[in-house]
Amino acid sequence: MRKIAIILLLLAGVCANAQTVVPAKPQKIYKKQDNKGILYFEESSFGALYKTNGWGFFYNKTKIIHATKKKFWEIEFNKTKHEKETKTESVFTQGGPITPKNYYYGKINSLYTISYRKGYTKVLTEKSLRSGVEISLNTSYGVSLGLVKPYELMLIYGDQTTDNITFKTEKYSSLNASTFLDQNSIYSYAGTWQGFFDMKPMPGATARIGLAFDWATFDDNITTMEIGLNVDGYLLNVPLMAVAKNHQVFPAMYVSMRFGNRK
């Protein structure tokens, strides 16, 4: 009887311990300490890019679908240059209302573009450790609005051998073409804001494909570099130069840096 009592006491103790064990909660699929799979649901970031024909700034919003796929949209502002743009030094050093500035000879317009793109990210190599790098393929397309701004120069009219001269800030036209393209009549670049209120819209489309390298995949912060090909096209030829062939389509290589956060 004594042995039976001892056995019953031991069994009672085991049962009591079993009742106090808290059942394990099911693990969430996405946890920061896992270092695998999707850790966040969306990204928000700002970036800058340099193209072989210009530069730009953009905002990116990304939704993470699963471990190897994301979708995003971007808004971008950029400037596109003609490949024949070459800065020229003014032949004048003083004598006018302003200090002479260098200018682009033959340039008649500047092109600024506001673009909206949507696209997808395909993760090619997942980052398994914090010290690793995630490589992804980004493809996107969208619509754009080009803003063609006149490129204005300060021109000299009159007899330069006398004091009977006049300085005029003008944009290119068929009436002043001979003076606008005469380096001896170009005193200076008029300035960035000249022609701002004479901008004309030019609708277009844009597409981009690139490889992205992200070395902060499992951190709250985003640090991503991307390299690839960008193509901008417009409804008509964009008149950027008076002395070179103008284009309707502008392909370019680019490199961009993007910084932001995940949540």
What is the predicted role of each segment?
Residues 32-41, 91-102, 183-192, 233-236:
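Flexible, solvent-exposed coil segments and beta strand-coil junctions
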Residues 77-115, 119-121, 125-129:
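Outer-membrane beta-barrel translocator/channel fold
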Residues 40-44, 51-55, 69-71, 110-114, ...:
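Residues that define the transmembrane beta-barrel architecture of outer-membrane proteins
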Residues 36-42, 64-71, 108, 124-135, ...:
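Short loop/turn motifs that connect adjacent beta-strands in outer-membrane beta-barrel proteins
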Residues 48, 57-63, 116-122, 141-145, ...:
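Residues on the lipid-exposed face of transmembrane beta-strands in outer-membrane beta-barrel proteins
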Residues 1-26:
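Bacterial Sec-dependent N-terminal signal peptides
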Residues 19-77:
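Short glycine/proline- and aromatic-enriched beta-strand/turn motifs that initiate or cap beta-hairpins
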Residues 140-225, 230-242, 246, 259-261:
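Outer-membrane beta-barrel transmembrane domain signature
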